[in-house]
Amino acid sequence: MKVIRAKSAGFCWGVERAIQVAREEARGGVRRVYTDGPLIHNKQMMDALSREDIREVGDYQSKQDLDLPENKDKEAVVVVRAHGISPQRRKYLKELGLPFRDGTCPDVGIIAGKVKLHAEKGFAVVIFGDPEHPEVIGLMGYANGQGHVVSNEADLLALPAFEGKVAMVSQSTMFTHEFQKLSGMLAEKYPDLAVFDTICGATKERQSDLLELVKSGADAIVVIGGKHSANTKKLAKLSASHNRPTYHVETADDLDEESFS
């Protein structure tokens, strides 16, 4: 059996950066680090980080109060997840009185900046993404009540009529072709639509590499990554949409060897 490894396999640079931030603050386990929800959507890495005293204390969407011990170490550090958070959440975390580090992926920070800027200018801001994903929840916090999330064509058609200017961005881990389709539809209704393709380069690269594997005639595709990761779930969906047997696994133990015999 021949195994072909995609060129872009592995964590993206934004995830690597968040891990680095947490580890810098942990100082090899000398100082405790609390993360507001999962730092990244990869259980195995989060388990590894927990052994370095980097502990997840928030919920998946970073909405609930942190479950900190009553005798929390005042030298501990709170680290923001790679997916980013809303301004309101940021204020809450800083008010905890603990040192604070931001692990937000810079690409997500750029999207938040575009949402904030255009909302302040009076634009209605349409965000293409999953309304339940922590990245989108964080972005909506910058929209000043003028944000609208769409995840498909039906959502787009259900949008209210906008009287003023409209801008559109995307969650960083969405399908490029779907964003192009929906932004094109919205531009037909609002010719002056300000469109920002904010799908990150790593996402595009991985989707492109997967399609290359499909075109090369691969008989099956194995996508390795967290079951809650938007990136890996999208890759598995993309592979399956091209009628390839697709296996989304987190570890080698998840592989069924008989499926490849």
Where are the predicted features?
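The feature marks the mature, well-folded catalytic cores of soluble enzymes
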Residues: M1-S261
